[in-house]
Amino acid sequence: MATQTVENGSKSGPRRTTVGNLLKPLNSEYGKVAPGWGTTPLMGVAMALFAVFLSIILEIYNSSVLLDGISMN
């Protein structure tokens, strides 16, 4: 068979590390949902600002916005 049986006595628990101990409080909130909208409006603002940033970069790339002193090929 391809499967292997492990005895209960020889099985060790999870290994404790310093990084794991530091990150454990962050994982303790797993599965909990804040009531209401939470930070959804903040995320919407961040997405809108990112869209504006991308449109500015696109306009510069397409030479729609002319910048003084910068030559575009």
From Swiss-Prot:
One of the protein's GO biological processes: protein stabilization
Post-translational modification summary for this protein: Phosphorylation is a light-dependent reaction catalyzed by a membrane-bound kinase; phosphorylation occurs on Thr residue(s) in the N-terminus of the protein.
Subcellular location: Plastid, Chloroplast thylakoid membrane
GO molecular function, one term: phosphate ion binding
Entry GO CC: chloroplast thylakoid membrane; photosystem II
TM helices/strands, residue ranges: 41-61
Keyword Acetylation: no
Protein name, entry field: Photosystem II reaction center protein H
The organism's taxonomic lineage, starting at the top: Eukaryota, Viridiplantae, Streptophyta, Embryophyta, Tracheophyta
